[in-house]
């Protein structure tokens, strides 16, 4: 199983509304691979507001939300954390993208507790740790997330965050952290598609 998402249009991604409206035309099974199509939505502020209208959320198979610097109106560490928690409590949001990339200062322990409570997965993001991104806090932050996930026995999802076709399923920056944290395979939902589908929190009916 593979899920493909485009950043929603608020951040200037390719995902204008008509793009998401047309996703129903795409087969959900191609070349023996099950596809889930969705959006990486923008968390806009410390209230946890998400962009795109709810009508579009309902059209998607998978809904990821994350903080992006171009449209994020942040505050203190506590305020930022509460904004992400509010987004996690949104019944449509199933995954929080790259919480460890350093765009906003966050309390990872609080996020992990809410992840366990709400079944909103936290992503361990490969691309944010690429040398070309110059995000020096990304690796230590993601290591902390792995250690907390292990402590609280909370599953995570690995994301390649591929910005080009050759980057798809590239987890080369994640694996050294997995080894360092001695992170158990059973908490990585990428390895268990059936468990991933069962773990995702149910969203409101379309």
Where are these regions (language model features)?
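Extended substrate/RNA-proximal surfaces in nucleic-acid metabolism proteins
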Residues: 7-124, 179-188, 195-206
């Amino acid at each position: 199983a593979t899920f493909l998402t485009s950043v929603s249009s608020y951040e200037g991604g390719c995902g204008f509304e008509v793009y998401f409206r047309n996703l129903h035309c795409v087969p959900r099974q191609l070349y023996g691979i099950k596809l889930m199509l969705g959006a990486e939505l923008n968390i806009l502020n410390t209230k946890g507001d998400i962009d795109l209208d709810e009508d579009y959320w309902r059209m998607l198979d998978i809904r990821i939300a994350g903080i992006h610097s171009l449209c994020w109106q942040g505050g203190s560490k506590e305020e930022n954390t509460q904004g992400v928690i509010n987004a996690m409590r949104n019944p449509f949001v199933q995954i929080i993208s790259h919480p460890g990339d350093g765009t906003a200062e966050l309390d990872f322990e609080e996020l992990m507790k809410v992840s366990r409570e709400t079944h909103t997965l936290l992503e361990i993001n490969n691309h944010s740790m690429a040398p070309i991104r110059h995000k020096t806090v990304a690796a230590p932050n993601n290591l902390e997330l792995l250690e907390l996930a292990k402590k609280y026995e909370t599953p995570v999802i690995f994301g390649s965050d591929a910005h080009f076709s050759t980057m798809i399923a590239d987890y080369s920056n994640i694996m050294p952290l997995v080894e360092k944290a001695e992170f158990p395979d059973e908490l990585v939902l990428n390895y268990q598609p059936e468990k991933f589908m069962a773990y995702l929190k149910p969203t409101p009916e379309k």
